[in-house]
Amino acid sequence: MFTSAHANRSAQASASAGHYAHRSGEQTANGLISEIVYREDQPMMTQLLLLPLLQQLGQQSRWQLWLTPQQKLSREWVQSAGLPLSKVMQISQLSPCHTVDSMIRALRTGNYSVVICWLTEELTAEEHERLVNAAQEGCAMGFIMRPVRNQGTLGRQLSGLKIHSNLYH
């Protein structure tokens, strides 16, 4: 998983998710927009990172909105992931050109604790600013999921952190 340029430019994006968790159980302290760039061949890594936060947000009275490109969330997956089926809403088959505007409108309402969408292209600076303002206005979190394909290493390792574990060797 990688972080995008927009995620690194905002002090809010670098704050821990716990800072934004509910104190009273009703409203987050502030809005947050985060772009999560992940490898399509390793979707479990993203789930391991996001599910605990989504489960915690599921304890709020507000909805969770998933703006998905084509696939529909399965009820079985939502339940097995520990998310409240009664608070998860999904809009699928959404055109990519309408996704950011739909996310802005949803965040602004304050009806959602979190809005998650999938985009294939990076956000512009103006789109990012509009999303941050909408998230702050609605005291909500927004996650932009952006998959990248594994391009292969072409004989050399990509730079990054490598953690060795005796549990797997």
From Swiss-Prot:
Q: Please note every region of biased composition (Polar residues).
A: 1-15
Q: What induces it?
A: By DNA damage, as part of the SOS response.
Q: InterPro entries this protein is in?
A: Cell_div_suppressor_SulA, P-loop_NTPase, SulA_CellDiv_inhibitor, SulA_enterobact
Q: Does the keyword DNA damage apply?
A: yes
Could you give a single Gene Ontology term from the biological process aspect?
A: SOS response
Positions of the UniProt region annotated as Disordered: 1-22
| Keywords recorded for this protein, A-Z | Cell cycle, Cell division, DNA damage, Septation, SOS response
UniProt function note? Component of the SOS system and an inhibitor of cell division. Accumulation of SulA causes rapid cessation of cell division and the appearance of long, non-septate filaments. In the presence of GTP, binds a polymerization-competent form of FtsZ in a 1:1 ratio, thus inhibiting FtsZ polymerization and therefore preventing it from participating in the assembly of the Z ring. This mechanism prevents the premature segregation of damaged DNA to daughter cells during cell division.
For this protein, the record's NCBIfam families field holds: PRK10595.1, SOS_SulA_coli
UniProt similarity note: Belongs to the SulA family.
Write down what this protein is called: Cell division inhibitor SulA
Read off the lineage from the record: Bacteria, Pseudomonadati, Pseudomonadota, Gammaproteobacteria, Enterobacterales
